[in-house]
Amino acid sequence: ELANEEQKNDWLPKLISGDCQLTFAYAEEQSRFDLEDVLTRAKPDEKGGFIIDGAKSMVLHAASADAMIVSCRTSGGQYEKKGISLLLVPKDLEGINIDSFETVDGQRAAEVRFESVRVEGNALLGREGDAFSTIERAQQSGILALCAEATGIMECLYKDTASYTQDREQFDRPMSEFQVIQHRLVDMFMEYEQCKSMLLR
């Protein structure tokens, strides 16, 4: 949405083909996911680029990504919505330190530190200092996608469980014929339908 034609031509074909992966680095240790609470700074340099200093928390799949879209403060104070910019930062630049770890759901995330990391001026996505509304929309879309994924997983688990109870026998009868099992399956089905209803609304 913010990329110019040059950035789209450089990155979109590689992203579509799967040859390149991006991740979004926006959360910080002190922010507790308040999107406007940004301490990571990007200062313009004399050559038209930016020098990035700061840290990002819980960056999903940072270690396996080729580049990061990083929210940085280019002006204003810590809690101001105005003054936040997005920079497209290749992962292999000097000064980037990635501390990767496994999350509770088996994914990978990382703490990422930027120490005087220099990017060119064309790393800026959109207008300088005007990225907050885009970050907000991206987060909302991401949350919706995760909810859809979780609802789909619930559907698979419910159907697999129902199928298993029909195949598995106990006391010479399928488990699905036992009332206590039927009650549990109904509970699973109702919880799945409630989640699907919330998602579609």
Stretches with model-predicted labels:
Residues 49, 53-97:
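A short core secondary-structure module
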Residues 3-16:
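A generic, well-ordered mixed alpha/beta core segment in the N-terminal half of proteins
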Residues 1-6, 32, 46:
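N-terminal glycine-rich flavin-associated loop
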Residues 4, 54, 87, 114, ...:
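Residue-level signal for inorganic ion chemistry
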